[in-house]
From Swiss-Prot:
This is Phosphoserine phosphatase RsbX. It comes from the Bacteria. One of its GO terms (biological process) is response to heat. Residues 11-198 form the PPM-type phosphatase domain. It holds the Pfam family SpoIIE. Keywords: Hydrolase, Protein phosphatase. It comes from Bacillus subtilis (strain 168).
Length: 199
């Protein structure tokens, strides 16, 4: 499944594949952009199939319902919602177009990389663990971005040796997605990524 959206501030592309043999994807995502900001989230439910989807879909719904709150408040809501569920790893990204600023928070192995036209990359080390309803520490990153910056948020179903080179070379989100196709064929795990290019 591929979903493409754009406005004057951003172009985005979402790509998702189920694990081979599974009818339900254990990953979920949410993305919404208006003329002021983007909020997006990717969640990877532990395991695969319907129980994994139950956890990741709960995170997607919470991000959608509480999108106006700050990133750390949203991720804490997501953590609390994982009580009596299998649990999930998750990343949440908010981008303020007017201030050219982004805020990012994650727990677990959903990765985020932002590459700037000047050659700098922002690649926060993930906090180990997963959202489970138990007390959890979070690390929130806030930084500014350059016009033309490109980013990807992806679950561990996408395993690319040097993903920054794809962000660097690709002229558009579609071109970057095409360059990643060769890494989406194994289907050993659910796979989800969100690509973005900031104007």
């Amino acid at each position: 499944m591929i979903q493409v959206e754009e406005n004057e501030h951003i172009q985005t592309l979402v790509y998702q594949l189920n694990k081979e043999g599974k009818s339900i994807c254990g990953d979920s995502f949410f993305m919404k952009a208006d003329d002021k900001e983007l909020i997006c989230a990717v969640a990877d439910g532990l395991g695969s199939g319907s129980l994994a989807n139950e956890s990741s879909a709960a995170i997607k719904d919470l991000v959608e319902n509480y999108a106006s709150e700050d990133v750390e408040s949203i991720i804490e809501r997501c953590n609390q919602a994982m009580k009596n569920k299998r649990g999930a790893t998750a990343s949440i990204l908010k981008i303020n177009f007017e201030q050219r600023q982004f805020t990012y928070c994650s727990v677990g192995n959903v990765r985020f990389i932002l590459h700037s036209p000047s050659g700098e990359s922002f690649y926060p080390l993930p906090i180990s663990g997963y959202l489970s309803g138990k007390p959890q520490k979070y690390k929130t990153h806030t930084a500014t971005y350059e016009k033309g910056s490109k980013f990807i948020i992806h679950t561990d179903g996408l395993n690319v040796p040097d993903i920054r080179s794809h962000l660097k070379k690709g002229q558009s989100v579609e071109e970057i997605s095409n360059s990643l196709k060769m890494y989406t064929t194994s289907r050993k795990d659910d796979l989800t990524y969100i690509l973005g290019q900031l104007s």
